[in-house]
UniProtKB/Swiss-Prot annotation:
Interacts with the late transcription elongation factor VLTF-4/OPG110. Interacts with the late transcription factors VLTF-1/OPG093. One of its GO terms (biological process) is regulation of viral transcription. The lineage of its organism: Viruses, Varidnaviria, Bamfordvirae, Nucleocytoviricota, Pokkesviricetes. Belongs to the orthopoxvirus VLTF-3/OPG127 family. InterPro entries: Poxvirus_VLTF3, VLTF-3_Zn_ribbon. It comes from Monkeypox virus. Acts with RNA polymerase to initiate transcription from late gene promoters. Keywords: Activator, Late protein, Transcription, Transcription regulation. This is Viral late gene transcription factor 3. The gene is OPG127.
Amino acid sequence: MNLRLCSCCRHNGIVSEQGYEYCIFCESVFQKCTKVQKKSNFHVSNKLIHLRNVLRRLLSHQCSGEIISELLDIMEKNQISTDDVDANFVSSFLKANERINKKDYKLVFEIINQVKDEKLNLSTEKINEVVEIFKHLVFFCQENTPSKTINYSFFLDKIFDITSVTKNLKPQTVKNYTKNNSNQLVWENFLAHMRSKKRVTMVEDYGHEYVFVDERFSTCSLEV
């Protein structure tokens, strides 16, 4: 299979589909004819795989117990309550800790979860609900936003909140306030879209049948 050079990321990753082309590396979409089908099977599947990895990570304890103990000692020394622990606090701690090489939002979420000693409500049914909402969000972003990049920490926190998985995994705010406001606006528009959307009884799952029962969605918290 010969993959052509992508003009955006400069990798040989251009794949041709009917009516459009997309890059398997940066996921850019290029028009081949007048009408473009914006939904990319690869894009949706890739996002769902990443989501599954995030959920698995939140249910595991990969962070060293020494790191957790060190953070708890700092909190006790400075009289910081677990209620005040958020992603900004944990991220600052990780940046100052030279023993941790990989500092990503999944590690931050895991540490917050351990520090607060919270049992996440992630049963099989709840995972199905999270995946369903996330899938609708991916479709919505593809159709209604100029960028297909999704801020996982921001949107997962929103989804976890409305599905009652947890209210404690507060994402880190970025210095670019325009970006923060943009994410919030996308979320509010997505909620409005879902509230006005009639229930769909059948949606392609792009090879992720293991998430659903009888190829139908579980009850969604966004339905009104």
